[in-house]
Amino acid sequence: GILMLTFGGLTAWAQRSFGRVMACGLAVEIGALLIQAGLGTVLSIEAIAIGIGARAISFGLLALGVSLLRQEFGSDEFDALRGAGRRLVWAPLAIGIGGLSLAGLPGTIGFVSRWMSIRSLALGDQELMMLSILASASVGIAVVRGLGALLEASPTPTPEDAPATLEMEAASRLETLRQLIGDIWARLKARALHLSVIAPAVTIVWMGIAPHTLALLAQSIANGYTFYR
């Protein structure tokens, strides 16, 4: 138990992914539970009983947040997720509540079990009590580092990058305008071709029908005039 607690505490703060932070936090919690079981006191048994439920909730929330990040961005590395928390709000919220509860931050559900563990250790071994506190703080530091990467603001362009950005935007607009003009020109050509085919056909039909129609009209007018007369 002491080895697992020490290993998890020494390595947790330096991790650069949420998956490794969870692994180190799990090592710390298993080590703490084994130490409490070795004490064999009533207070340590109560700490184990409450701690199992608190740790299950904490790990569940932390795993939920990490799962959301992996599903959306395909990674849980801090460097790959910089600023991702501003686009996926629920992930940093779940990681913050679960991770800080796992570290035993006051005001979270994990603080109750952590406080009972510290009290039981304080009655027997002061060194183990300090080791447990430092290991929990190491997990908390790792979680805070990860949250800082998630909530990091998007980098603003430097003055040297600004002209390049403006040139790219202008080129994009010119390309859009060129495509629009090309589309209009293609439509006009298609309409002109359509009219060039229809107009001669209409002319031919009209030239064939018009004389006969005019003759019939003249005959009708003449007949009408004769009848009324």
Per-segment meaning from a language model:
Residues 85-91, 143-229:
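Cytoplasmic/organellar membrane-interface segments at the starts of transmembrane helices
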Residues 1-115, 119-151, 158, 162-163, ...:
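Hydrophobic transmembrane alpha-helices and their helix-loop junctions in integral membrane proteins
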